[in-house]
Amino acid sequence: MHSASGAAVAALAKGAEILKTIIGEAEIALGGIRWKAEYETDEKVFCEEVLAPLLRRMGFLAVRYTHGVRENGRDFTFSELTSFGVMRHYGLQAKAGDVSGGVNSAIDELIGQADDAFKMPYYEIASTEPRYISTFIVAISGRFTSNAKDKIVQKVPRGVWGSLLFLDRELILELIGRYWAVS
């Protein structure tokens, strides 16, 4: 008797998970995304539910969520074909919440990640050709407080200043409005 009720509970739980996924996909397909408080605290959810689909909707190619031990400062890698007919490669580091410019902040970590992202190659699936990024993006689900962006820019080599982009919640929501709309 208990095994039958356990199986029923497991089946209901699986069904609930499937429905949750379907509802999420329907919301996205209908052109909207509800910003969740969870995005401010859970980097993985922010990456999977916001950044990955947004990058794809923006038309980037080979969008890969690479978060983990061998990410080399990049939670995402992706590319685009430029007007000159060459591929431009990007690296994106995501953070949940705000980034501040205060003492003992996440800035030194971000600077190290940017340095790794530019210096270390990455490899596409089934390719032995190393790829190097030309643009590094810091995307956060909160906002950059005080002088955070200025500190990052001032601490990286001057040659990469024009290759750094900063996306906060406000700009991400603007991009969602532009690229996530129902066609």
Report residues per predicted region.
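Mixed-charge (Asp/Glu-Lys/Arg
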Residues: M1-S183
